[in-house]
Structures are given as structure tokens and as C-alpha cells.
């Protein structure tokens, strides 16, 4: 179980597959501890993929005396990449948090980044997104993890999928399980998300960028993702018309993989 001491903390990480280096990051959770499940199908066949636990998640440690910010989580990744000797990495940020980390890495260390993918992203929070994120955190704190889990799942999945898969989405082994009995980390992740603001710096990103818009996303809709496409010089944008906050189901996953690999293959 690799654990790296970087940026005054300890990060758990895994590397799957072979090929050009890539990093895959999600939202308030982790792609680790799943034998590569959850990653885009075929990604580890073509790329050497790094996944890691954000500080405070699972086996990564955190220092609560350091204020949480997207720049802090980006500095963790930068230090990990430097320790591994990785450069010219494809950064794949999905479902919120990972996008902000990728943006900050692309801004501060463009030498590390070969391309960047953002989906479920924002450059800064408006009142609507701020209140959503605050409400998720408040429900967790005041009512408990399982109420939060149900609440966030209702916002993140389409009704048809939720109705058919509620038994898998909810419960101890359900979604966002990394935050169960871990409110403090959730609080800090939300702090980082609320404070994230690259609106005035997007023009400085020189990395080839793809922004994927999820037309039915009730959290990070095209309202928050389109400004990133428009703000980064030369960025490409693709809309998935039938997708909510999380890509689910065979058809959506195939569509997502086609979009992702079409972009990565060009860079």
C-alpha cells in the first residue's frame, strides 16, 4: 500500500495500467481501494493511471491546523507527481473537486500537465452553487451521514436511475461512503470548493483542455461549466445531453469514453 510523505502530510496512492501518465480525480471521495473499478473503461489499457486519497480521506492524513483550499490539495498532487518523477501528465478531473485541483495544477505547474479534462466543474461558486454545497454539509452535520447521502444522491442521479438502484446507492456500502464517520473531512472539502476561484486566471491556462458539459446535472450544470470552456484559450467543449452529475449506465459510459479517448488521443 504506497503512502507518500509529501507537502507535510501522508497521501495514499495507487498506480494502475501502463502507458502515458494520467491522473484521475473525482469529487468528495476516491478512486482508490477498488482495483481500478470506477475508472473509465479502457483507461488503464492505454495509460498509467495515478489515483490517490485526498488528505483526510481513507488512508491519507490531514493537518487540521492548515486551512483547506483547492490550492492546498493541488500542492499535494504536485508534490506527489514530483516525488514520482512524473511530467506531461493527462489530468482528468471529474465530479467537482478534481476539476478544481486540475485547474490549480495547470496554473501553477504547467510543465507537469500535458492535457486537462474537466467535467462537473466551476471556476467560482455563484449563490446557487454555494448554497447547495453548504446545504449538503449542513445536512451531514445536523441530521447525519445517511440523510446527507440520500440528499446528495437525489441531486446527482436522474430519477429513473435512482429508482432502479436506490438499494445500491444508499447505505454503508453506498455512494460517498468515504465521508461516513468523517464529517471533519467533508467540512474541509466543502471549504476548498467554496473558496475555489480561478475566474480571473482561466486565460492563463495554456494546457489543451476539454470541458464536458452534463446537460441534466442539477449541481454543476452548464451554467457553471460553460464559463470554463469560454475562459480557457482554445478549450474544447462537448455536451452530454442525457447525463446528470454522475455518469451512469452502459450508454452514458460508452459515450463518455468515446469523448474522453477522442480528446486524449489527440494529445
Describe the residue ranges of each PLM region:
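Conserved alpha/beta-hydrolase catalytic His-Asp/Glu region
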Residues: 127-129, 147-196, 200-201
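Conserved HGGG/HGGXW glycine-rich cap/lid loop of the alpha/beta-hydrolase fold
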Residues: 5-62
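Flexible "cap/lid" loop of the alpha/beta hydrolase fold
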Residues: 103-107, 114-143
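Acidic catalytic loop of the alpha/beta-hydrolase fold
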Residues: 216-220
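Short beta-strand/loop motif that positions the catalytic acidic residue
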Residues: 205, 211-213
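Catalytic active-site module of serine/aspartate enzymes centered on a nucleophile-bearing elbow/loop
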Residues: 235-267
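Active-site loop/oxyanion-hole signature of alpha/beta-hydrolase fold enzymes
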Residues: 50-92
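Short alpha-helix in the alpha/beta-hydrolase fold that links the catalytic acid
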Residues: 207, 221-230
